[in-house]
């Protein structure tokens, strides 16, 4: 059902842009599960556009169809350029897209130049080391925050962002990125670990962080991954924290998907509470990886 809806929705977006925003939009692009083969019956379509004018931003829409949430959002050329320079973690939004509308051949060529630049950067060892270091340092700053007095939901959110940053660091360090997004990040990290000389503990601590039941476990295991990845890519950190040993393995993919999705949702709920005064929801207080 979702696939049929999504296919119709793509046609609707194309027609709406051509009919109402032809002069206002540079490009409309699809990415994510709809084009990479990881869609399930509850998948949306991941779609963004690059505006040409202020009016173009009016194309942005958030809505629900058949119980599935959709978000058609804008991204400017500057942000796309930052992604190509590996300064952002949204690399598939430039590297793995299907363009369904372009204002002109020149706009298309401009985007293709960004893709070529990104490909060049992914082959440049110096650029990759700097990008990996930046992500590891960002993870360390999050770790410093996680060690402050925080409720469980905040600790779980921070721990989730720590391991996502570190997974990105490992992937970029190895001339790659997660083409299939958060949904398959752990599986792709395991695959990368088997193909490259990546410490297995990186995967173990990633999984233990997701499975953590207490604040102390979340802190300990996210820091365990921080130490392991930092040592692997040559970034040192000043603090030490005892780490325990654990077993790794591929648990149900749904667990990782739900955990990281919950982390991202918690961030959005926190932003809405802070910016708009909406009611506060601490959904991560109730997350249990083995009781979904």
Question: Where would I find each of the regions flagged by the language model?
Answer:
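Short amphipathic alpha-helical segments, especially helix-boundary/capping motifs
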Residues: 9, 115-121, 143-145
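Short hydrophobic/aromatic-rich motifs at helix boundaries and adjacent loops
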Residues: 5, 32, 111-116, 138-141, ...
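Short, exposed beta-strand "edge-strand" segments with a Pro/Gly-rich flavor and a Y/T-containing core
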Residues: 66-75, 99-103, 175-179, 190-191
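Glycine-centered small-residue hotspots that permit tight backbone geometry or close packing
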Residues: 22, 106-109, 196-197
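Metal-dependent nucleotidyltransferase catalytic core
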Residues: 1-43, 48-97, 254-286
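Intrinsic-disorder-associated interaction segments
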Residues: 2, 6, 100, 104-107, ...
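Internal, well-ordered alpha/beta segment that forms a basic, Gly-enriched binding/recognition surface
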Residues: 77-134, 138
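Conserved nucleotidyltransferase catalytic core and NTase-mimicking acidic/glycine-rich helix/loop elements
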Residues: 126-292
